[in-house]
Each structure stands twice: as C-alpha cells, then as structure tokens.
C-alpha cells in the first residue's frame, strides 16, 4: 500500500512561531496526524542557535504560552514559548545540541494524547523532506489540499522502523539557576553530569564550580600519570592532532561558545572593515561629582545616580549637538543615516561575554529614568534574560572601565553599523594650577575619555567637535538640563 503525504501550511498565533517552520504531515499508512516543531527564530538576525534545555519531556501536555525549551542565541538565552494545545510526542534534538539552523525540526507534537506512543521510534528523517528544505514563509491564504502518491521504493521508509531512535530523549526537566546554566554553557558542561544541592535538586553556581574543581583535579591526576610514563605518552601521539605542549605544560581547552564566536566575528569585521580613528580628552568631572552627590542626597531612595548614568546623559546632549556622531554607515542602501533619537548602548561584562543593552530615547528621559533603566538592563544582561530588541541596535555606545583604578586610558572597537564609541577610564586626582590656592595649585578629579570614530561617517574635525561638546557638558553639567 502506497503512502500519501498531505502537507498543510499552518499559520502560528505567535510572533516566535511565525518565524519558524511548522508543517503538519499526515502519513496515512504510518503515523497519526502530527505537527513538526521547527527551530524558532527568536530575533530578526538569528540564523541558528543552541538548544540549551528542554523544559518539557515526551508525553507532557502543552498549553499556549508555556515554555517548552530554552534557546541560546548569539547573545542571550531565551525561553521558547509554545502557542498551541497538545502533547509533546517526540523530541528530535537533544538538549545541549549546538548550531541548529532556524526551521530545522526539533520536536513533534500531537493533539491527542493517545497518539503519543506511536512516535516512540520516530526519527528526524521521518519528518519528511519538505519540512527540512522549505525556508519560505507559508502564505496566509488557504491552499487546496494536494495528495501526492509516493514512489513504491519509498513506501518502506514511511513506516516507523523497529530499531531504536538515535536521539535519546531527556529523562525529565533539570532545574538550574540562570547563572548556573550560563556558566555551564560557557564551559561546555552537561547539566546532566552535575549534582544539584539546591531545593528540589536545583543546580546552583556553587554546584557548577564544585564540578569544575573536581574535573580539574581528575585532569591533573591523569596528566600526572601520563608524565610518569613518557614512553606510553609518546606512543599515543597521533598524526594530525594539535601540537603537543611540553610534558610540564598545564592548560585547559575551553569550547568556543556561540556568543564568543559571534563577538569575535563582529569585532574582526569592525577592525578590518572600518577606517577608524581616535580622539582623547582629559575632562574634569569635579562639578559632575558634586551634582551627583547633591541629587542623591535628596533622592529619598527613588534613585541612586552613578557617574555612568550622568555620562550617558552627557553623551546624549553632545550627540544631539553633533549628529554626525549619532549615525549609521549603510553602504548597501548607499546612505549615512543620522538619527534624531539617541539610543545609547551600554557595554556590560557578563559571565559569557560582552553585551550592550540599549537605553532608548535618552534625549527624552531624565537622569532618574536613565539610571533606573540601566540598572534593570544590566541586571538582566548578567543572567542572559534580555530580549533581542534590548541589545540589538543602538545609535552610539559607551564602554566604562572606570571601576578599575588601573585603567587610566583605553580605546574601544566600534560596534557596526554605529559610528562612535566612547571609552571611559578611571577617575584620577590631578594637581592643577590655581592662583587662588595658598600653594598655587589645587587637586581636580579628571577622567580620560577616548572616542573611536568611523571616518566614513564622521570626519576628524567633526570627531574633535563632538569631544569638545562632550567636555563642555561634563565640565558644566547643568547644561544637561537645557
């Protein structure tokens, strides 16, 4: 009996699923009616991602809005919320799998729980060639159903095979804190190998660190044994492997995460493709510090301004005065796009790498609102809970290393297609000439700010003008109120 396959386009009710391929296939001679769940596109630029964890197991009921998996994109770990009623019949891709292309089948769901056992041995190849190769968005208009008779030689493969599936299904949800998941992904650790000591066996940061410490000890013991038998170690060397270090060398190979790979690609693109130049300026922040102290003294716990909050506002004012610094270079559109709004990207160090959450429309916001937004964004950035639109974009960037008193000057790499990034060093007390002082000098609090500019968008004279305006605003902070 030949198998007939009906492919029915289904339009999702979710913004996530509208960007992922979901094809309903019914094989009359094999499997009950079911739906293939594709790898979702969780951001406009996402082409692939890592499946960090399944939060549902095979046979579990699915309800609209429930999280069924955690997906790691290039710069964030995000929840995949499903928007249909049904049951998870088969997991096609195990958790921990990396670099899964968008739309690739990752699971199967059915509407009737009684159909779940039929998919015990369902495999990725059984999902049908159309579901793996089609990349175009499905049309919204209903299409006439088409039946296509399969060739006789393919009839055998339409029925479920008796042998066990190569994809092992997870044994249940693994509970872990967001920080623990982040560190595990960065270090290439499977959470299944870690014993959780938190409530309900929840894996914590301490559990991950304990696992790493034990692994390190075992590794050192192994290398010690190998060093004791150099003849055996020599014979085990294989051709084509990485150059072997000396017998006394100690090192650790850390897998390159998706995030580190993307950061590396973008920064390499920036350094090789942008004709950048730098302009540095020593700027007095004594008045800025006094303003901050005065405002915080009367805040009544409504806000607590940092130096960085004030600098973000100062950069905003300078960008409005010199629009060339607040622009994109867009060669594909043959334009330089100058923005009227100022969206400041704030560089934040996280356990997995650098993120740049965005404070949008800073020109229309006061200091307290900017401060509160930065604190909230930084908090979520450090546990990889930012939405893509919260860190993708921005019109100008600030990178602040002022908390490290060893950094008195540094430069940053432009984040394309932006044209400007400001590098903020630490505050230094500097002796300056002061005729009114008893000894002829006094001490001033100064900071070195270095701007890196894209010469295609903003000429050197304009870059210098921007730094002059920034210096003026910082040294006369009341101008931020104008």
UniProtKB/Swiss-Prot annotation:
GO terms for molecular function: dihydrolipoyllysine-residue acetyltransferase activity. It is found in: Mitochondrion matrix. Residues 175-212 form the Peripheral subunit-binding (PSBD) domain. The active site is at residues 455, 459. The modification N6-lipoyllysine is found at residue 75. InterPro entries: 2-oxoA_DH_lipoyl-BS (IPR003016), 2-oxoacid_DH_actylTfrase (IPR001078), Biotin_lipoyl (IPR000089), CAT-like_dom_sf (IPR023213), E2/Pdx1 (IPR045257), E3-bd_dom_sf (IPR036625), LAT1 (IPR006257), PSBD (IPR004167). The lineage of its organism: Eukaryota, Fungi, Dikarya, Ascomycota, Saccharomycotina. The E2 component contains covalently-bound lipoyl cofactors and it participates in the generation of acetyl groups from hydroxyethyl-thiamine pyrophosphate-E1 and their transfer to coenzyme A. Belongs to the 2-oxoacid dehydrogenase family. Residues 122-170, 214-251 are annotated as: Disordered. Its EC number is 2.3.1.12. GO terms for cellular component: mitochondrial matrix; mitochondrion; pyruvate dehydrogenase complex. Residues 217-250 have a biased composition (Low complexity). Binds 1 lipoyl cofactor covalently. It catalyses: N(6)-[(R)-dihydrolipoyl]-L-lysyl-[protein] + acetyl-CoA = N(6)-[(R)-S(8)-acetyldihydrolipoyl]-L-lysyl-[protein] + CoA. Its cofactor is (R)-lipoate. Eukaryotic pyruvate dehydrogenase (PDH) complexes are organized as a core consisting of the oligomeric dihydrolipoamide acetyl-transferase (E2), around which are arranged multiple copies of pyruvate dehydrogenase (E1), dihydrolipoamide dehydrogenase (E3) and protein X (E3BP) bound by non-covalent bonds. The keyword Cell division does not apply. This is Dihydrolipoyllysine-residue acetyltransferase component of pyruvate dehydrogenase complex, mitochondrial. Residues 1-28 form a transit peptide. The pyruvate dehydrogenase complex catalyzes the overall conversion of pyruvate to acetyl-CoA and CO(2). PROSITE patterns: BIOTINYL_LIPOYL, LIPOYL, PSBD.
């Amino acid at each position: 009996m030949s198998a007939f396959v009906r492919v029915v386009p289904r339009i999702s009710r979710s913004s996530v699923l509208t960007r992922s391929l979901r094809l309903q296939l019914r094989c009359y001679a094999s499997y009950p009616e079911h739906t293939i769940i594709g790898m979702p596109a969780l951001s406009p630029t996402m082409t692939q991602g890592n499946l960090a964890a399944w939060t549902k197991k095979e046979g579990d009921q699915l309800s609209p809005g429930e999280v069924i998996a955690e997906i790691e994109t290039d710069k964030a770990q995000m929840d995949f919320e499903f928007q249909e009623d049904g049951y998870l019949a088969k997991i096609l891709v195990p958790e921990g799998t990396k670099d899964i292309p968008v739309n690739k089948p990752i699971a199967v769901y059915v509407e009737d729980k009684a159909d779940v056992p039929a998919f015990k041995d369902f495999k990725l190849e059984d999902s049908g060639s159309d579901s793996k190769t089609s990349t175009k968005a499905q049309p919204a208009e209903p299409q006439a159903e088409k039946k296509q008779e399969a060739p006789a030689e393919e009839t055998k493969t339409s029925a479920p095979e008796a042998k066990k599936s190569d994809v092992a299904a997870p044994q249940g949800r693994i509970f872990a804190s967001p920080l623990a998941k982040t560190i595990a992904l960065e270090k290439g650790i499977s959470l299944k190998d870690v014993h959780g000591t938190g409530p309900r066996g929840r894996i914590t940061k301490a559990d991950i660190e304990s696992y790493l410490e034990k692994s390190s000890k075992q590794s050192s013991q192994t290398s010690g044994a190998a060093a004791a038998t150099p003849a055996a170690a020599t014979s085990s060397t294989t051709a084509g492997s990485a150059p072997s270090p000396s017998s006394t060398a100690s090192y650790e190979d850390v897998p390159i995460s998706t995030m580190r790979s993307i950061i590396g690609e973008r920064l390499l693109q920036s350094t090789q493709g942008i004709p950048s130049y730098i302009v540095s300026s020593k700027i007095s922040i004594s008045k800025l510090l006094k303003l901050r102290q005065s405002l915080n003294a009367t805040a009544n716990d409504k806000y607590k301004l940092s130096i960085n909050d004030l600098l973000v506002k100062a950069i905003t004012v300078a960008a409005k005065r010199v629009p060339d610094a607040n622009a994109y270079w867009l060669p594909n559109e043959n334009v330089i796009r100058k923005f009227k709004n100022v969206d400041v990207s704030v560089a934040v160090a996280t356990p997995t790498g650098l993120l740049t959450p965005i404070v949008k429309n800073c020109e229309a916001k006061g200091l307290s609102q900017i401060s509160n937004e930065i604190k909230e964004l930084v908090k979520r950035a450090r546990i990889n809970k930012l939405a893509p639109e919260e860190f993708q974009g921005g019109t100008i960037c600030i990178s602040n290393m002022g908390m490290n008193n060893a950094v008195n000057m540094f430069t940053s790499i432009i984040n394309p297609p932006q044209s400007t990034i400001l590098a903020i060093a630490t505050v230094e007390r500097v002796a300056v000439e002061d005729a009114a002082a008893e000894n002829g000098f006094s001490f001033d609090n100064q900071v070195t700010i270095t701007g890196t500019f894209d010469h295609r968008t903003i000429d050197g004279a304009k870059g210098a003008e921007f730094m002059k305006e920034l210096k003026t605003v910082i040294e006369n902070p009341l101008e931020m109120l104008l």
